[in-house]
Amino acid sequence: MGKRARGDDEHGSLPGALQQRRNRRTNTSFEEFIDVDGLKTAVEELKRRSEEPDTEITAQQRLEAKYLLKYAEEYTKLTLLSSHASLSGRIPRVGQGGVEVWGRLFTYHSRQGAGRRYTTIERLGRGLQRGQYGSQRDGTNKWRAYGQQGCPKALRSRFVGRFCHDVDIKNCHPVIAVQLPSKLTLPASYGRVELPHFADYAEHRDSWIEDIATLHEIVEHTEGQRKELVKNLFVRLMYGGQYEAWSRTMLNRPLQHRHSGVDHVCDELVKLREAVFASEEWGGFAAAELERQAAKGKDSEACKRSTFSVILQTIEDDILQVIVDAFEDLGWKTTTLIYDGMHVLDDPSLELTDALRHAERRVRTVTGYNIELTEKPLFGLHEQPIELTRV
């Protein structure tokens, strides 16, 4: 541990205090453990499920089972290759005799010294090949990152759920974005940047989701799928996407009804992005990032979307590191960074709720942002059947 992340010397002009914290960040390698028995039983279960008769499994579930099986098998091979002998063994568990694990040391780096940090493994490839279904499933290229950061959610509980907790920044990007205007120094020509509708969404997300799902008659999905579909709308809007495009691509139909609140949110987010790019704090960074994105051949709007995304992810990562430090101060061991959250090893002598509240206070003191931390389902779910219906 203590290795400087590759790319941290390539940063642009980030806001002063944030830049100073990033410069001091040296704790960017984490020991990650994998449950040996959990990996084995995952492969066995997925083999069995992928061969079930059509009366027991849908065609989509069979594709998902085969995809997860291939991932688990490749994961096993890479884990055997990369597992550090000094980390393998048993995690002490009071009263339980320990859990047999494979251990790996992951180094995290940021691209151009900004945005999120991603995992690497020395001398090994960073990816597991997806295949055609995997690429369509995840809407991205044919490689999926190795490690818990890139692991499908359906497998995480089997791989680490016996001994890890999943700590998450609740509604992370909307919560950050709503607080951004109060942290900007703007030219005199700018008035106040107000986000009343977007702030209401951030605070009452579930009721907004239900209203929008009802308006657009999203009824053929599970509750979790409905929620993710509507959340996707607001993610798109934050980064310059269009209401109409969301309906075409996610609902597979033209936009037939408009939610007035969503239209107001669109207008507010346009003003927010413009203000961030014009601000004293982020203007220099934004100009450099816009130029870098343009050099990739992107059009103007795509450059703006990417740049705003990098800015929010940079703030997110800064907050996440403060959380990591706060947990470590209390004796917790972080194993994995997962964008707006992290995994920590269970310790029966420590109280997770106390750590969550302590980290929230630390984030408020250090960064000025008010966040809510929550534990997502993971710990203790290692014996649950693997979910083949995607949320």
Model features per residue range: what roles?
Residues 166-169, 234, 333-346:
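Catalytic palm active-site di-aspartate
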Residues 312-330:
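Short amphipathic alpha-helix segments
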Residues 300-315:
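Short glycine-/aliphatic-rich beta-strand segments at the starts of folded cytosolic domains
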Residues 241-248, 301, 349-391:
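C-terminal polymerase-core module
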Residues 142-303:
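Helical catalytic core of nucleic-acid polymerases
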Residues 323-324, 337-339, 346, 375-377:
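Active-site proximal loops enriched in glycine and acidic residues that flank catalytic Cys/His/Asp
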Residues 1-156, 160-162, 369-391:
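Non-catalytic nucleic-acid-binding interfaces of large nucleic-acid enzymes and RNP effectors
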